[in-house]
Amino acid sequence: MDVSLQLYSINQETKKDFKKSVEKVSEIGYNGVEFAGYGDLTAAEVADLLKETNLYSVGSHCGLNAFTDTFEETLAFNKTIGSKYIICPWAKVDTKEEIDTLVQALNAAGDIAAEENIKVGYHNHAHEFVQVDGKYALDIIAENTNDNVVLELDVFWVAYAGIDPIEYIKKWGKKVELIHVKQINENKANVDVADGILDMKKIKEAAEYATYFVVEHEEFDKPVWDAIRNDYEALSQM
């Protein structure tokens, strides 16, 4: 499995020293990173850092305003650093109007990004499994976005919402191009990959159209770097 790390997982470390943190991610063995901020570096500096550490950019998590207000700038930055995706990590989807606004923004940005061979995506939490007009909000998003817009499915949050991640991955098939590998236990806590209830091997097998598997870890019962290393080792042995 080609394993990358969502850098938000180590945000307390990147706040101290962004470059050294990224270097440590590479030293552990991760193949790529997904950004949630750039440590005040320019696009050229980020590109140089990736080259120095032999990492690639899966993509970036950018707020919805980056799609609606500053997408040309967002796209240019991600083109420079070699991103494959630009992902919206959260949006309000409690009403049909909010979903429509999100879908329109993603479709418009996706069409523009496609000209640079970059795709746009949406990353779920649990609130997208609210029922809106008799359907899950995430289903409405998936149904109404075009082929330039994909799902980055966070399996922790799918399970947290009471949905089987494997069945949900199969439901959307080709739409699911990225998986957030994030483990959950019986108490709905985020734990090391090896210590939870989700079978990541079966999830990988179900996600037959997914190219990128991105570790995200937000709750820690041990030093951060120990957990990040544990996750990599568990997945690399898969």
Where are these regions (language model features)?
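Structural preference for beta-strand elements that scaffold enzyme active sites
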Residues: 2-4, 32-34, 56-61, 84-85, ...
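Short acidic, glycine/proline-enriched helix-loop-strand junctions
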Residues: 42-61, 109, 116-118
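Active-site-adjacent beta->alpha loops and helix N-cap segments on the catalytic face
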Residues: 39-49, 96-105
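Active-site acidic/histidine proton-transfer and metal-coordination neighborhood
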Residues: 64-150, 158
